[in-house]
């Protein structure tokens, strides 16, 4: 009688789960089991299973069985809620060795549980499984792994050893991490970090692009400052000529007191000035050959030959086929913005009056 009542209770309660409070539904099942056992005392006939079947039937319809009403009252559930969640015109027969139900007056009678000693054990297990509500199999009790193989339906061809347990217990061993493995996990989780990101190529950010641009600008400014330094040193050398030798000073003293010599004497002084210009150009760095101007030779005056204009700082762009025009791209030296970027003052630069001597390789 205990097994048959349990099968009927599981079938009825399966309709009430997830619709009514679970705790009260459990109390409802306990009270219903207690009331059914009390009702079936003296009306249970294993020798004649169908004797007293109408008395043991539980009916829920327009009229609800008094056992259902009493169990709902004891559990604190409303009888209308219980009847509304159960199928209409539900009848459950609880007989010795068999439990069946019917939904509707003209519905088919379906067997939930049957116990026939002539059948094999596999068939009994199949009937026990079918005793639960097929529409709510999620409420089937979960057994331990040892008995889950026997309670599950047997596979065909008798391969019972290949049946896997339907429920595997979760491992109870605590998770342990070393310092290295814990550092490789995600923050707030035990999952490992994605290692695929480490193999990706680092992308260039706008900050990195800005740094490269600044470095290129600094390199350009350094090249411009070195070129202007060499050009300006060449202009000062032509304007402030080094101290001549005593013989040249004696030649210049009478010329300062006398009126300017005629044109033929100026033509005689041109070769000396050209030699001085060649010495000055040879004193430059051999790596700065692009600053040696080919049209400087053959000019009348050294200052006007290099930089034609009113003053040596009033530079005009020179025409060359393969040379880089610094002043056409960045402006003249008189512009304040260009001079400020060079980080030094051109007017305060000091140059020695000693004449540079060319280095001759043996």
Swiss-Prot record:
Keyword NADP annotated: no
Region (Required for interaction with CPEB3): 161-220
Motif (Nuclear export signal): 228-236
Summary of the tissues where the protein is detected: Ubiquitous.
Regions of compositional bias (Low complexity) in chain numbering: 144-160, 238-256, 265-280
Motif mapping: Bipartite nuclear localization signal: 22-39
InterPro entries: Anti_prolifrtn, BTG-like_sf, Tob1/2
Region (Important for nuclear localization): 82-92
GO annotation (BP), single: positive regulation of nuclear-transcribed mRNA catabolic process, deadenylation-dependent decay
Molecular function, one GO term: SMAD binding
Result of altering residue 234 to A: Not exported to the cytoplasm
Keyword vocabulary terms for this entry: Cytoplasm, Nucleus, Phosphoprotein
Subunit note: Interacts with ERBB2. Interacts with CNOT7. Interacts with CPEB3 (via C-terminal RNA-binding region); recruits CNOT7 to CPEB3 to form a ternary complex required for mRNA deadenylation and decay. Interacts with CNOT8. Interacts with CPEB4.
Functional note: Anti-proliferative protein; the function is mediated by association with deadenylase subunits of the CCR4-NOT complex. Mediates CPEB3-accelerated mRNA deadenylation by binding to CPEB3 and recruiting CNOT7 which leads to target mRNA deadenylation and decay.
The protein's name in its UniProt record: Protein Tob1
